[in-house]
Curated annotation (Swiss-Prot):
Binding-site residues, [4Fe-4S] cluster: C62, C66, C69
Protein name as catalogued: Biotin synthase
Organism in which the protein naturally occurs: Clostridium perfringens (strain 13 / Type A)
Its biological purpose: Catalyzes the conversion of dethiobiotin (DTB) to biotin by the insertion of a sulfur atom into dethiobiotin via a radical-based mechanism.
Subunit structure: Homodimer.
Bound cofactor: record note: Binds 1 [4Fe-4S] cluster. The cluster is coordinated with 3 cysteines and an exchangeable S-adenosyl-L-methionine.
Catalytic reactions of this protein: (4R,5S)-dethiobiotin + (sulfur carrier)-SH + 2 reduced [2Fe-2S]-[ferredoxin] + 2 S-adenosyl-L-methionine = (sulfur carrier)-H + biotin + 2 5'-deoxyadenosine + 2 L-methionine + 2 oxidized [2Fe-2S]-[ferredoxin]
Gene that this sequence comes from: bioB
Length: 319
């Protein structure tokens, strides 16, 4: 207990925790760990929950070999494959989310990146959405250069999403068609272009607890202010189809430690919420203060109205 309180004090003072301290926290008393992670969240952020939503704007046929992903051409899955959606379809979904009180909306596209005519089309999409709607715009278009990121910002995008997925040490066990450094460079490019950055990862890929802590520390070093935590949904046909799902306690411990290491960030529940009781009710009591709501890329999420009810029932509020 004394150790957890000491770590809480360091976190509130924004003193960086070490990986050894992170590991000790992970293995500490669950009830006290969750309680103090929640107290850090309350003291720094209050009781507001940030909601975001996404649309799978271009699906499948991805040339990268990410072991977890249903959209990779290296995997045989039953997902829908289609090119970039037309503007009216995307606008309709964005407007529905805005009307429901969601704060942010992102177009997500499959592939290493988005190039040429498709990229220019999506720039037009963002520009039009920015003029016609009030919802904050985010973008997720893979590995990208600074020049293209500046174009996104000029079109009205406020935040770029690009996950690191796991630790630097474990990354080549998950993907070999591009490097960890390319992902880090994309994040740095986005920040240099004046964009906010959303970056997190996936837990349950076969990584160690130290890999998760290393990821949390890397995100802290990059000063990421929105950190989505996905829990692997093992999809049939992918390389990780036989991975055993994480149990709720391990997920909650991970969320709590991420809160200690990244006290000023939004810790955002993302994919795999269905593995948690009531789509993550306890996670919001373990330091999380944001969530993706609605459907995800190739899996179903929680309905917006149900998330709003959940948040209200636990005594928190939507920003």
């Amino acid at each position: 207990m004394d150790f957890i309180l000491k770590m809480k004090d360091k976190s509130l003072k924004n003193i960086k925790l070490t990986r050894e301290e992170g590991l000790r926290l992970f293995n500490s008393n669950l009830e006290e760990l969750i309680k103090e992670a929640n107290n850090i969240r309350k003291e720094i952020h209050g009781d507001g929950i940030d909601l975001c939503s996404i649309i799978n704007g271009k699906s499948g046929r991805c040339g990268e070999d990410c072991a977890f992903c249903a959209q990779s051409k290296y995997h045989k899955t039953n997902i829908s494959e289609y090119p970039l959606l037309d503007y009216e379809k995307i606008k309709k979904v964005a407007k529905e989310n805005e009307d429901e009180g969601v704060h942010r909306f992102s177009i997500v596209t499959s592939g290493r990146g988005l190039y040429g005519e498709e990229f220019e089309r999506v720039i037009t999409y963002y520009s039009n959405l920015n003029k016609e709607l009030k919802i904050n715009l985010c973008a997720s278009h893979g590995i990208i250069n600074k020049e293209s990121l500046i174009k996104l910002k000029k079109a009205g995008v406020k935040r770029y999403h690009h996950n690191l997925e796991t630790s630097r040490n474990y990354y080549d066990k998950i993907c070999k068609t591009h490097s960890y450094e390319e992902r880090v460079k994309t994040i740095k490019n986005a920040k240099e272009a004046g964009l906010e950055v959303c970056s997190g990862g996936i837990i349950g890929l076969g990584e160690t607890i130290l890999d998760r802590i290393d990821l949390a520390i890397t995100l802290r070093e990059l000063e990421i202010k929105s950190i989505p935590i996905n829990v692997l949904s093992a999809i049939k046909g992918t390389k990780l189809q036989n991975m055993i799902p994480l149990n709720e306690e391990e997920i909650l411990r991970t969320i709590a430690v991420f809160r200690f290491i990244n006290p000023e960030a939004k810790i955002r529940l993302a994919g795999g919420r269905y593995l948690l009781k009531n789509f993550g009710e306890n996670a919001f009591k373990a330091g999380a203060n944001a969530t993706i709501t609605g459907n995800l890329l190739t899996t179903c999420g929680n309905k917006i109205k149900d998330d709003k009810r959940l948040i209200e029932n636990i005594g928190m509020r939507i920003f």
